[in-house]
């Protein structure tokens, strides 16, 4: 006995609203065989559309059994149901349900996208279907540019895209004029004569008379099931596919993916052999074309992802202003994060460079304790300096004696800071000689009245004159300027005070007449630990003095502390800037949630033509991620632009962009797109197709 293509046993469907139970379908028993054209007729509210939704796997019954190709639909997973809709069902809706932002060809291609068909072949097939339906001049028209009859033909072509073994037509002529209605009915009858099973849902008995069987449904029950003898008599016996030979040439070697499990009998193939004289009406061989190398799961998945990106981009372009306003929060947040990090890096680099110019790997030793008045504490002397010179971890050392005095040149008198140092001081502090010479050991030994001045001080004291060999007076003591050095901004005194360096022996004997020194600066060997050396110096001088009557200042330790401080400051400011990214992310989630509501019908259409939950979820996730990433790219570009403008301004701080700031920006924008886009995407994927299609 021939197995029915579709069999419903005791199907019931009801809805609950609080304590109220509304029964829509009652004990439906129905068999539909392959190749039949069946009309289900009923008034509005009779349950005919609910029955169609159950047959088309858009809805599930509350009780009863539904078999298709011999398999109970209750045993199928969500993905298997999607595969069933994708490869075996074709829907023709009363309101066409075309995607408004796609052309006629692209609308027809949608089912094949979810079947992961080759792009070129599916485009060829979509064009051929539309041409066969008389729409060769409207291939690139969007739905708004088509008449009602033309839109319904596009809907029929979409139903046939993956083969359309079973065509479900819900009031296909309800929104058409009489001529267009006759054309659509002729197409459906022609499809049935050539092998497709057609199930026609209508309220009009005149429309139903075109079918082989007329099933009347009233108040959720089948009240009659009669054959149309005339239609059965005129149906030809030799069936061929709807697509002509030109399309068949493109779509050869059918290899339809089987619905049944491998260990079950393939009723689809058997049924095809019985009814098509060796030719399969499910002409979807383009889904598995052996000439193409895209059959591997990896490449086909890649194609699917590429299509998701393309569809997401199309949706963004369809709502340009809304998309831009959505990504504006991300743009501002990325600008803030990148610019703040770059500003922090630039500030840190400037400060570290300035402090590095004071001397690398140095330790300064001061008398007394931190906070003491150094003028009243005299615990350091030249013996301490000589002792430090003997230590293996010390590369060079210099005493420092300080004195504030009036410097006079001709009729110009200025406040000056006099530093008594050794010849090692200039190398230790990274001073660069501009002109003249530095004093040497001979000058130290003979306590020569010579001095070195910095470039800024030379300009203040001598104006444009060459300072070399000029005589100045320090407290009426003559001093010959022998050299000019370049110092960093941290080494320069502010205001009108000038800096002069003289031999420490000259300072001690000619100016101060003292034996003690106010500071010792030590530069360590390159490969020693500053921390251990600092401890060794403290232990050494503590033993010599009998007590710790001094304190040290390590440049390396200070730079480490400064680096940590600037990093913490940058992190704090970046955290504040990151808040704007969070706000932008919330904006994306809000817009995507609204988008899900606005596009509910589109989601229903995509599910009806074969989209799986993961396809819908991935598409919306891609949209939110693309909005975030594009916003991130624009934000980075704006940050670079602002950084360039900032650098052109006369500021002492330079912007320092780093690769890490760009990576952080793109990581943040990607994560925001994924995190804040996930919940709207999940909501979209969880929509029931029958609910989605019913919303306006």
Swiss-Prot record:
Keywords: Antibiotic resistance, ATP-binding, Cell inner membrane, Cell membrane, Membrane, Nucleotide-binding, Translocase, Transmembrane, Transmembrane helix, Transport. GO terms for biological process: response to antibiotic. GO terms for cellular component: plasma membrane. One of its GO terms (molecular function) is ATP hydrolysis activity. The chain crosses the membrane at residues 324-344, 576-596, 626-646, 659-679. It comes from the Bacteria. Residues 255-274 have a biased composition (Basic and acidic residues). Residues 275-284 have a biased composition (Low complexity). It is a multi-pass membrane protein. ATP binds at residues 42-49. InterPro entries: AAA+_ATPase (IPR003593), ABC3_permease_C (IPR003838), ABC_transporter-like_ATP-bd (IPR003439), ABC_transporter-like_CS (IPR017871), MacB-like_ATP-bd (IPR017911), MacB_PCD (IPR025857), Macrolide_Exporter_MacB (IPR050250), P-loop_NTPase (IPR027417). It is an enzyme of class 7 (translocase). Its EC number is 7.6.2.-. Residues 6-244 form the ABC transporter domain. Homodimer. Part of the tripartite efflux system MacAB-TolC, which is composed of an inner membrane transporter, MacB, a periplasmic membrane fusion protein, MacA, and an outer membrane component, TolC. The complex forms a large protein conduit and can translocate molecules across both the inner and outer membranes. Interacts with MacA. Belongs to the ABC transporter superfamily. Macrolide exporter (TC 3.A.1.122) family. This is Macrolide export ATP-binding/permease protein MacB. It comes from Haemophilus ducreyi (strain 35000HP / ATCC 700724). The gene is macB.
């Amino acid at each position: 006995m021939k197995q029915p293509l579709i069999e419903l046993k005791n199907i019931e469907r009801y809805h609950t609203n609080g304590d109220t139970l509304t029964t829509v379908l009652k004990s439906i028993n129905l068999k539909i065989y392959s190749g039949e054209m069946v009309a289900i007729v009923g008034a509005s509210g009779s349950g005919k559309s609910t029955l169609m939704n159950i047959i088309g796997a858009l809805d599930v019954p509350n009780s009863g059994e539904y078999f298709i190709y011999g398999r109970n639909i209750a045993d199928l997973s969500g993905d298997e149901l999607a595969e069933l809709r994708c490869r075996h069902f074709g829907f023709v809706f009363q309101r066409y349900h075309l995607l408004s932002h796609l052309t006629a060809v692209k609308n027809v291609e949608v089912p094949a996208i979810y079947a992961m068909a080759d792009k070129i072949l599916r485009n060829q097939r979509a064009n051929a279907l539309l041409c066969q339906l008389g729409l060769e001049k409207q291939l690139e028209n969007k739905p708004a540019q088509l008449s009602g009859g033309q839109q319904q033909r596009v809907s029929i072509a979409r139903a046939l895209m993956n083969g359309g073994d079973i065509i479900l037509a819900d009031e296909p002529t309800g929104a058409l004029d009489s001529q267009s209605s006759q054309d659509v009915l002729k197409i459906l009858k022609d499809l049935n004569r050539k092998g497709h099973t057609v199930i026609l849902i209508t309220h009009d008995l005149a429309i139903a008379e075109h079918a082989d069987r007329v099933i009347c449904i009233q108040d959720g029950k089948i009240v009659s099931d009669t054959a149309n003898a005339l239609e059965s008599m005129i149906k030809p016996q030799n069936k061929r596919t709807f697509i002509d030979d030109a399309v068949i040439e493109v779509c050869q070697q059918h290899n339809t993916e089987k619905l049944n499990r491998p260990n079950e009998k393939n009723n689809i193939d058997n049924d095809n052999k019985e009814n098509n004289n060796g030719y399969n009406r499910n002409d979807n061989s383009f889904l598995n074309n052996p000439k193409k190398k895209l059959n591997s799961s990896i490449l086909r998945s890649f194609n699917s992802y590429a299509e998701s990106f393309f569809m997401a981009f199309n949706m963004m372009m369809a709502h340009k202003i809304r998309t831009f306003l959505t990504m504006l929060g991300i743009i501002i947040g990325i600008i803030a994060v990148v610019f703040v990090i770059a500003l922090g890096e630039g500030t840190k680099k400037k400060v570290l460079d300035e402090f590095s110019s004071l001397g690398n790997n140095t330790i300064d030793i001061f008398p007394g304790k931190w906070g003491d008045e150094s003028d009243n504490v005299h615990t350091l002397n030249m013996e301490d300096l000589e002792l430090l010179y003997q230590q293996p971890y010390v590369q060079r050392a210099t005493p420092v004696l300080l004195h504030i005095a009036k410097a006079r040149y001709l009729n110009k008198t200025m406040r000056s800071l006099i530093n008594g140092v050794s010849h090692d001081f200039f190398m230790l502090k990274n001073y660069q000689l501009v002109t003249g010479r530095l004093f040497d050991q001979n000058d130290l030994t003979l306590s020569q009245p010579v001095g070195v001045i910095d470039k800024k001080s030379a300009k203040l004291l001598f104006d444009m004159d060459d300072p070399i060999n000029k005589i100045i007076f320090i407290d009426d003591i003559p001093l010959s300027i022998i050299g000019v050095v370049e110092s960093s901004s941290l080494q320069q005194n502010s205001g009108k005070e000038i800096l002069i360096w003289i031999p420490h022996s000259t300072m001690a004997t000619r100016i101060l007449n003292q034996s003690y020194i106010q500071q010792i600066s030590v530069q360590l060997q390159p490969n020693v630990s500053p921390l251990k050396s600092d401890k060794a110096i403290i232990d050494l001088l503590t033993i010599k003095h009998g007590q710790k009557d001094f304190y040290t200042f390590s440049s390396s330790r200070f730079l480490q502390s400064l680096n940590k401080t600037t990093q913490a400051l940058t992190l704090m400011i970046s955290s504040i800037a990151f808040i704007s990214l969070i706000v932008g992310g919330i904006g994306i989630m809000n817009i995507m949630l609204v988008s899900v509501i606005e596009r509910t019908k589109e989601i229903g259409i995509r599910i009806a033509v074969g989209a799986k939950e993961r396809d819908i979820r991935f598409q919306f996730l891609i949209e939110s991620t693309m909005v975030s990433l594009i916003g991130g790219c624009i934000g980075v570009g704006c940050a670079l632009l602002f950084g360039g403008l900032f650098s052109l301004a006369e500021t002492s701080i330079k912007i320092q962009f780093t690769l890490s700031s760009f990576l952080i920006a793109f990581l943040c924008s990607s994560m925001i797109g994924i995190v804040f886009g996930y919940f709207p995407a999940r909501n979209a994927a969880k929509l029931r197709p029958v609910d989605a299609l019913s919303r306006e």
